[in-house]
């Protein structure tokens, strides 16, 4: 049983999948850092919040009455919050990852795309008398019954 598992695990597809998962996790952390540390701070400055992740709505005050400066302070007080900023960060991260994967798949598909084969020779020709499509080997048109010269 161990031998079968080892053979399964060493097949190319499983190893490729494992490498893809590891690289995907690393890529996800890079995109998360890009969103949290590079993209969202300028947007946060534009809307008046320096830390965009701390944009939240207090649904129910905790033991200590609000307002709370951060999500962490609200959670420490036992408040129930709707963390809008963290959700927006996650959406932006998802969009960036999805767009990056789209571009990657597009490039890979372009690399592996087979070149268009030469168009196959036509199997029919037009009858010179009635313009109906007839097989190349036909010597008489089935539509108008005219005799047609053999195909070249």
Swiss-Prot record:
<protein>
    <recommendedName>
        <fullName>Large-conductance mechanosensitive channel</fullName>
    </recommendedName>
</protein>
<keyword id="KW-0407">Ion channel</keyword>
<dbReference type="InterPro" id="IPR019823">
    <property type="entry name" value="Mechanosensitive_channel_CS"/>
</dbReference>
<comment type="subunit">
    <text>Homopentamer.</text>
</comment>
<keyword id="KW-0813">Transport</keyword>
<dbReference type="GO" id="GO:0005886">
    <property type="term" value="C:plasma membrane"/>
</dbReference>
<dbReference type="InterPro" id="IPR037673">
    <property type="entry name" value="MSC/AndL"/>
</dbReference>
<keyword id="KW-0812">Transmembrane</keyword>
<dbReference type="GO" id="GO:0008381">
    <property type="term" value="F:mechanosensitive monoatomic ion channel activity"/>
</dbReference>
<dbReference type="Pfam" id="PF01741">
    <property type="entry name" value="MscL"/>
</dbReference>
<keyword id="KW-0406">Ion transport</keyword>
<keyword id="KW-1133">Transmembrane helix</keyword>
<comment type="similarity">
    <text>Belongs to the MscL family.</text>
</comment>
<feature type="transmembrane region" description="Helical">
    <location>
        <begin position="14"/>
        <end position="34"/>
    </location>
</feature>
<feature type="transmembrane region" description="Helical">
    <location>
        <begin position="84"/>
        <end position="104"/>
    </location>
</feature>
<dbReference type="InterPro" id="IPR001185">
    <property type="entry name" value="MS_channel"/>
</dbReference>
<dbReference type="InterPro" id="IPR036019">
    <property type="entry name" value="MscL_channel"/>
</dbReference>
<comment type="function">
    <text>Channel that opens in response to stretch forces in the membrane lipid bilayer. May participate in the regulation of osmotic pressure changes within the cell.</text>
</comment>
<keyword id="KW-0472">Membrane</keyword>
<keyword id="KW-1003">Cell membrane</keyword>
<keyword id="KW-0997">Cell inner membrane</keyword>
């Amino acid at each position: 049983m161990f031998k079968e598992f080892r053979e399964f695990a060493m097949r190319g597809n499983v190893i490729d999948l494992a490498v893809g998962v590891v690289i995907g996790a690393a890529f996800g952390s890079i995109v998360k850092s890009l969103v949290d540390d590079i993209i969202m701070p300028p947007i946060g400055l534009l809307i008046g919040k320096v830390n965009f992740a701390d944009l939240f709505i207090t649904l129910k005050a905790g033991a200590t009455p609000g307002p709370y400066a951060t999500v962490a302070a609200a959670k420490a007080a036992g408040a129930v919050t709707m963390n809008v900023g963290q959700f927006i960060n996650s959406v932006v991260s998802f969009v960036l990852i999805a767009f990056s994967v789209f571009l990657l798949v597009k490039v890979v598909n372009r690399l592996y795309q087979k070149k268009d084969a030469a168009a196959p020779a036509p199997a029919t020709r037009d009858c010179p008398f009635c313009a109906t499509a007839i097989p190349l080997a036909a010597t008489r048109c089935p539509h108008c019954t005219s005799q047609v010269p053999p195909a070249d």
